[in-house]
Amino acid sequence: MSKQKIRIRLKAFDYKLIDQSAAEIVDTAKRTGAIVKGPVPLPTRMKRFDILRSPHVNKTSRDQFEIRTHQRLMDIVDPTDKTVDALMKLDLPAGVDVEIKLQ
């Protein structure tokens, strides 16, 4: 698996959870002898929703809600077979979305 790179992209609503997961991935990869670049924080995406408070009148009175999606990006350069096996066995929290690409 020489001359390859694994790109890992993490997404979560909770920044503490995503930082903890990124630290676990970095520790696992370094323990197996791979070179890790990152985690790089990507821009946080915010979705905002305006909802009427009253069902009938008072159009100017509204509630505002937002969802923040935090993202991190990591590259693992020259992964070994041990690195891939360790990453596959890694147990991450349920609130973290993981995308893995081989390049």
Curated annotation (Swiss-Prot):
What disulfide bonds does the UniProt entry report for this chain? none
Identify the species of origin. Answer: Delftia acidovorans (strain DSM 14801 / SPH-1)
Q: Which HAMAP family match?
A: Ribosomal_uS10
Q: Name one Pfam family in it.
A: Ribosomal_S10
**Classification via PROSITE patterns:** RIBOSOMAL_S10
- GO annotation terms (biological process): translation
Q: What is this protein called?
A: Small ribosomal subunit protein uS10
Is Transit peptide among the key words of this record? no
